[in-house]
């Protein structure tokens, strides 16, 4: 990468030029990518566990979509960290498939619980992606997280629709406007 330094008053200002991928990551970008990668590893294992516990076939399909989304993100984040000489965080092992009948009913996550956890993850993921998009100075990092954001928003919309169809959505108190007479 090429850095041009310009002296303005008593402050040196760095101006990056050329391909953003040739620019160094700043510490916030490194920390965010590393943290998101560690989180992605954990989510894959957690979603595999949810898949084993889920009984509803529509929910299982969405869980597969969440796993694939996380795997896609992990692959891209690993590449960025490796390219920039940053050690990868540890990853839990993949979860083996289990038969739902072999999980005792009291020890099993039920479908509405799984769906609620996925909804929470989708919402938190949107916030996390937005935060990285806002602090990134490398255009490629900001755009990558914009892609992650879009994928999470689409998964969240599918999940919301499923929650409504299955009757799993527990709405907060609703504000209903009643006209004054």
Where are the model-predicted features located?
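Preference for long, well-ordered alpha-helical segments
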Residues: 121-181
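Alpha-helical scaffold segments that form or flank carboxylate-/histidine-based iron centers
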Residues: 25-33, 57-75, 111-114, 139-153
